[in-house]
């Protein structure tokens, strides 16, 4: 990690109002332009040639604060830097510059992340609990609670490889929402759920926030933003375009999207 970059995790403190502080954050990721090929990789390795890789800027001078006990929704078009932001926040991706201060234990919820296809849904619940350091006596009781919340019925004892995308999402949301993370990062995990289950999850998120937990939610569902979020962050081309009241930020984003659509239609004529 460079001298200009720091990722700091501090113990939760009742006296601090911010769960996450992000200051002038910049990050990039690498994209390989040629198709992966063993012979090409070996030849490049032996000749000390580099693979054809492009560095793509993802975040540029991003600054914001996430209040403790809030639900902050991150919106924007594909490629705006939303998922990259979550990866930086939880420490998966090291930023090039800037500073992140996280006060509390984080859990990243992304469909399929940390799950084992060979295990049943119930076994994956236990695996997640053990990974979070949960005691065995608590885990046994909580497993049944999580299984009931996921609403998978008998499929909870089926191998994960038999699950649909929506079923995986239900299980992942149920596990993450019940392992008592102080900060929960959700990456598009609610996009595939039905209306009833989304309402079910919204109630749980409200309950977590009432306990002082903090949620950062990446989503394309603008209706979810308006109903669930207390703050909204609009990312555009890796920069903060707007931050504040969800209704206001969503309205500005929709106005911009409509103008872009009109410009595109005009250019096509």
Where are these regions (language model features)?
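ABC-family P-loop ATPase nucleotide-binding domains
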Residues: 52-55, 110-171, 177-179, 185-191, ...
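H-loop/switch region of ABC-family ATPase nucleotide-binding domains
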Residues: 219-220
